[in-house]
From Swiss-Prot:
This is Auxin-responsive protein IAA23. Highly expressed in roots. Expressed in seedlings. Gene3D superfamilies: Phosphatidylinositol 3-kinase Catalytic Subunit, Chain A, domain 1. Residues 39-53 have a biased composition (Basic and acidic residues). Homodimers and heterodimers. Residues 1-12 have a biased composition (Polar residues). Signal peptide: none annotated. The gene is IAA23. A motif (EAR-like (transcriptional repression)) lies at residues 23-27. Aux/IAA proteins are short-lived transcriptional factors that function as repressors of early auxin response genes at low auxin concentrations. It is found in: Nucleus. Pfam families: AUX_IAA. Residues 21-36 have a biased composition (Low complexity).
Length: 193
């Protein structure tokens, strides 16, 4: 027991005292001589350095994402101002598409675009010239023929191609590819009401 009493009075064998072995929130490798009174001084010194820094320039700030240059933004605005988007629906299809009427020069390119949109379920049958006359959209599974119709400003459903192209673009609200059996009653001057 004399050895244990001698160990209590003598310094520890490893040379570390209680303060050296205490767990603190300091970073690893920081000196143990730094006390809690020294940390606020360092913090104040670092804070004083940042007080003199200038704020970032207005160009360095991120305004929107993704970053788009001004000329590209303006081009997008101009394109959207000229665009005449209308919804396109197919009888029996659970989804709609949009088509830009201003991007097409006439009925034939519009019908080709409609076929391209719904190529997975529709095929083109018949064949006329390049004007799109005589072509019909046919369902691949059932064989039903579809006729392109549109709703005008007055809410009347009319056949696509019954009016001049410019008048069609101005008055079209939406396009519907109807089954030809349902579109029998549609005519250029008759309303569906």
């Amino acid at each position: 027991m004399s050895t244990s009493s001698g160990a209590d009075s003598s310094p520890p064998v490893s040379g570390l005292d209680y303060d050296d072995t205490a767990l603190t929130l300091a970073l690893p490798g920081s000196s143990s001589s730094s006390s809690s009174t020294a940390d606020p001084e360092r913090k104040r010194a670092a804070h004083a350095d940042h007080a003199d820094a200038k704020p970032p320039s207005p160009k360095a700030r991120a305004v929107g994402w993704p970053p788009v240059r001004a000329y590209r933004r303006n081009a997008l605005r101009e394109d959207s101002a000229r665009a005449k988007l209308v919804k396109v629906a197919v009888d029996g299809a659970p989804y709609l598409r949009k088509v830009d009427l201003a991007a097409h020069a006439g009925y034939a390119p519009l019908l080709r675009a409609l076929h391209g949109m719904f190529a997975s379920c529709l095929a083109v049958r018949g064949g006329g010239g390049g004007d799109g006359e005589g072509t019909k959209l046919v369902d691949l599974v059932t064989g039903a023929e579809y006729v392109p119709t549109y709703e005008d400003k007055d809410g009347d459903w009319m056949l696509v191609g019954d009016v001049p192209w410019k008048m069609f673009v101005e008055s079209c609200k939406r396009i519907r590819l109807m089954k030809s059996s349902e579109a029998v009653n549609l005519s250029p001057r008759r309303s569906s009401r």
